[in-house]
Amino acid sequence: MAELQEVQITEEKPLLPGQTPEAAKEAELAARILLDQGQTHSVETPYGSVTFTVYGTPKPKRPAILTYHDVGLNYKSCFQPLFQFEDMQEIIQNFVRVHVDAPGMEEGAPVFPLGYQYPSLDQLADMIPCVLQYLNFSTIIGVGVGAGAYILARYALNHPDTVEGLVLINIDPNAKGWMDWAAHKLTGLTSSIPEMILGHLFSQEELSGNSELIQKYRNIITHAPNLDNIELYWNSYNNRRDLNFERGGDITLKCPVMLVVGDQAPHEDAVVECNSKLDPTQTSFLKMADSGGQPQLTQPGKLTEAFKYFLQGMGYMASSCMTRLSRSRTASLTSAASVDGNRSRSRTLSQSSESGTLSSGPPGHTMEVSC
């Protein structure tokens, strides 16, 4: 009989002295985020150069997650709190991400010369095919905020075969009317560009409260070295055309859509109206309580949870585990309609602040989340 030999097994990822498993997990997450700095590229388009940053590697038979930020922000200030959130890591490990910066909004961007003709929002949408062609990506799941949500919606109308799903936060699909235009001009006489943009991003209650978050973003926008560029993007947003969505008509989004807005947010009415114009069997409406004007900044955990369910409804991440938010609330989720061959689905959720449970509701209703 062969002599038995003693084998010493070493822990693959030993803990540091005094380090708890939770602290080790947080350190590992921080290290992974620090190491993945992304690769930044620029590509020429018919309307000028556009810069974008790619994180991760393409996954076979999976779309890329492509983001587009709002006015006054770039991809980092708009999306970093969301995509660096711990529970989001399970999602981003399964998808390559492309974060697009509007022209002149990227870090270190030079100020455009006087008289520069900034692209319209429609033209910004027409830049996206150049990005996808450069990367050789065929389909995307778009995540946009404010002006970025409009741009992705316009792109989806023009290129429906390349968009598998959309998460549209604070979208206003309507052109400014005469009353809106007059109010904007009047506000411009008494308010600075940074203050007008802050009023676009955050609710009046948030601005009056002057929280640490508001102070941070007021400082970012007020002292932005490319403030002249930001004003050009702002002007393009205010001169947007109507998307002309029509429920049951030819002009509509043909992919699954999740509309998101904060309760009492500046764009709440616009998002509610947008929801009324889209196909209810393809659209989920998430109204988030206590999230203010930028839910991806203030409530990344809740938005991550909703995004995960959205992806599961499209047929991705079916075996995904529940996040801490759901586990802690022993939540249950049921789909209002099963996924068909085209991954079409309609799902509505409501979350009660009293019971703290998720439940399904009839199609077309609001998904309200409050904790």
UniProtKB/Swiss-Prot annotation:
Record field: compositional bias (Low complexity): 347-361
Disordered as annotated region, ranges: 1-21, 334-371
Residues carrying Phosphoserine: 326, 328, 332, 335, 338, 344, 350, 352-353, 355, 370
InterPro entries attached to this UniProt entry: AB_hydrolase_fold, NDRG
One Gene Ontology cellular component: growth cone
Subcellular location: Cytoplasm; Cytoplasm, Perinuclear region; Cell projection, Growth cone
Residues with the N-acetylalanine modification: 2
Keywords: Acetylation, Cell projection, Cytoplasm, Developmental protein, Differentiation, Neurogenesis, Phosphoprotein, Tumor suppressor, Wnt signaling pathway
Residues where Phosphothreonine is found: 20, 330, 334, 348, 357
Principal localisation: cytoplasm
Family of the protein in this entry: Belongs to the NDRG family.
Subunit-structure text: Interacts with CTNNB1.
Described purpose of this protein according to its UniProt entry: Contributes to the regulation of the Wnt signaling pathway. Down-regulates CTNNB1-mediated transcriptional activation of target genes, such as CCND1, and may thereby act as tumor suppressor. May be involved in dendritic cell and neuron differentiation.
The protein's name in its UniProt record: Protein NDRG2
Organism: Pongo abelii
Taxonomic lineage: Eukaryota, Metazoa, Chordata, Craniata, Vertebrata
Gene: NDRG2
